[in-house]
Swiss-Prot record:
Keywords assigned by UniProt, alphabetized: ATP-binding, Cell cycle, DNA-binding, Helicase, Hydrolase, Iron, Iron-sulfur, Isomerase, Metal-binding, Nucleotide-binding, Nucleus
EC identifiers of the protein: 5.6.2.3
NCBIfam families the record matches: rad3 (TIGR00604)
Organism of origin: Aspergillus oryzae (strain ATCC 42149 / RIB 40) (Yellow koji mold)
Function: ATP-dependent DNA helicase important for chromosome transmission and normal cell cycle progression in G(2)/M. May have a role in changing DNA topology to allow the loading of proteins involved in maintaining sister chromatid cohesion in the vicinity of the centromeres. Has a specific role in chromosome segregation during meiosis II.
The protein, known as: ATP-dependent DNA helicase chl1
InterPro entries: ATP-dep_Helicase_C (IPR006555), DinG/Rad3-like (IPR045028), Helic_SF1/SF2_ATP-bd_DinG/Rad3 (IPR014013), Helicase-like_DEXD_c2 (IPR006554), P-loop_NTPase (IPR027417), RAD3-like_helicase_DEAD (IPR010614), Rad3/Chl1-like (IPR013020)
PANTHER family: ATP-DEPENDENT DNA HELICASE DDX11-RELATED, DNA REPAIR DEAD HELICASE RAD3/XP-D SUBFAMILY MEMBER
Amino acid sequence: MEPQAEEFHHPYSPYDIQLQFMRALYSCIEKGKVAVFESPTGKLAGLSTGTLELLKRFQHKSSAHPRQDEDYGDEDIKILYCSRTHSQLTQFASELRRVNMPSSIPKDFSEGVADTDGLQEGVRHLSLGSRKNLCINPRVSSLDNVTAISERCLDMQQPGVAAEQRCPFLPSNENEAQVLQFRDHVLATVKDIEDIGKLGKDIGICPYYASRSVTKHSEIVTLPYPLLLQRSARDALDLSIKGHVVVIDEAHNLMDAISNIHSVTITLSELQTSLFQLTTYARKFKTRLKGKNRNYIAQVIRLVTSITDHLKTILETSQAPEGPVQPSDLMSGKGVDQINPYKLCRYLRESKLARKVDGYSEFSRERADRQADRKPSTPVLFHIQSFLLPLMNLSAEGKLFYIKAQGDIQLKYMLLDPMNQFREIVDDARAVILAGGTMSPMTDYIHHLFPYVPSSRLGTFSYGHVIPPENLIAQVLGKGVTGTEFDFTFETRDSERMVIPDGVVAFFPSYDYLSQVLSIWKRTLAGEKNRTVYDLIEGKKTILHESRDVTISTEELLQEYASIVGSGRGALLLSVVGGKLSEGINFSDRLGRGVLIVGLPFPNIRSAVWQAKIHYVEQKAYKESSGSDANRQLVAKAAGKDFYENSCMRAVNQCIGRAIRHRNDYAAIVLMDRRYDKPAIQGKLPAWIKQSMASSSALRPAGATIGSLSKFFVAQRTSKT
């Protein structure tokens, strides 16, 4: 039976679109589907209320009809809510606090209670985090590197460690009462990650390890991407996905996140440091090491030497600044061909060689650092090991690249296809929900993340905006005031005629292009004495811009921008697609009356990484297609083109989504490039944007577009007075 609006216990009266979203979410989870949801407003409240109502119904069914099968284990169904950052997880926790669920105590049992309507039921919620977020031991938390923190923590737990060197906050039989106290306090009210850390500090128990005992008692668990998307992280937290519901918010960058989490980069300098540490360790303990251990350490030294020598050759030659690397070239050193990669991988995992070598190196460094008053450096070999493991077992989905940078050279293992890494989650979970404000274009999720999921289990949902249609105008500006066509391709980006300042927040394809624009604006105009385009704009709006260099923090830049806008003077904020201001920051009301997207921010097709990605997509499409070779080639090329365009348009849609944050907000969206008028490009925009572009055309003169914008804002001012 479809839930009614009041059954979701939304903190406010939900709009019709929000109610549709919550009902569809409820239905998908109940039926065990894999679904992608796009909802530009009210998404967070919809996710919290929709999942809570479902939990309560599951619990009611479970208590009324205990299940006989054990398909999903002994635990009740949980909601595992995942997002990219802890700030987004904190926002979700805030939404949970606002939902008031009625008591599930039957009325028969509540007779005689004075105010049954006042009975409410809380949700058992747990925020999970990494050691970096939750460690309360100052000897460990003071380290500024995630790997160093993890290694120091594990070192303190090793057998034989002196009592004074062990962590006093680690849960044990002696402090079991504190662990139970921690559990009860965590489950009493909804707490975010900072609350969890403070609670552990107040009680005197490690919140990272104590949280494990809370997981099985929780109904909703929130956690960041790395803790959900890595099997090793889930195992470390004793977190099972089997039979539970996985909800991933802000999922527009999920595929990139999976690839990045399972990709590793090392540098030549790190390899050289690890080689020195390995040889020093081998010489120091050569008489104590067993023959088998000496042999494996010698193999690691030969392998690291071979990789180091090949990178030095690339660095010292006049090869391109970046390019692909063949595994056979890295393993061409003397004696490397005799190494059994599977046995060496097992040895690296089981022997904990990296921890031993890094531990000895750190002990040696600490004595020198104390004398020189230096901070301990990062454990290097542990990082090298994380690269060697995938190198020893390369899959078809991964590829190696080198990148020269500032006298050093990086070696990068890049996961090209996230499907298999995510499949275990999809197969184990009861239901998987991907949600975001702007998830368009959605074809990538279907083709590259869920191609194996039956269509009967798969669903996509895109909801409109809560604003009335007259509160948005979206225009393609394909020509300048002089009639020059806007075509911000790589080949035409140096043309000075392409730049027309307009709007409040402008997003440029890259930092380099933004620098070019600022340089052109600051040139003296022909026939003008010491007057520049920059001066003319400054006469109307104060110009602020994002910078690659950290000369000013994002918070300071936004505060200055908001202060100028709040003072009544206009401001033009120049930003970069994919930069600090393009995600997670909302420009509502006067802060975002206009959003300009300058050009299409396609990734650099000439980069080795993107050439490899597109080649992989094309090869996969070719293998999966049928018909003649010519037809399969066409299918492959179309798949590569679509994948490339989708990456660009996901970034564009994220920028567009920064504006219009509530029902009474209004804004103009201007897409400055004639290519936005192509049906293939417009088809990848969110539906609520496309609806506003029905009468737009890149062939219209700039004056006509500017006239439309002027009428739009006049109408808005009139309606608000």
